[in-house]
Amino acid sequence: MDDKKQHQDNLHIGRLIKSELARQGKSITWLSTQVNCTRENLYKVFRRPWIYTDLLFEICKALDYDFFNECSEFYKRHKDAEI
């Protein structure tokens, strides 16, 4: 599998969060205050394809967006395929 195809088939939660934050027009400073996390740590979150569930829960509440559902939908689409 080439890198581009693999990239498209993998869930990257950090990119999803960054995208939703931008869509809502909110700053990383705002989010860091809401979730009690430094901006530097949030930038690291954006670069990672994984996240701790407790932090994801806080981000979901702050942005009023269900990222857990994104994960669930990804699972449903890929549960029978090799990831």
Name every feature range the model reports, one short phrase each.
Residues R48-K61:
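Short, basic-rich loop-to-helix N-cap that marks the start of a DNA-contacting helix
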Residues L31-S32:
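Short alpha-helical "recognition helix" segments of helix-turn-helix
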Residues D64-I83:
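Short C-terminal boundary/hinge segments that cap the last helix of small helical domains
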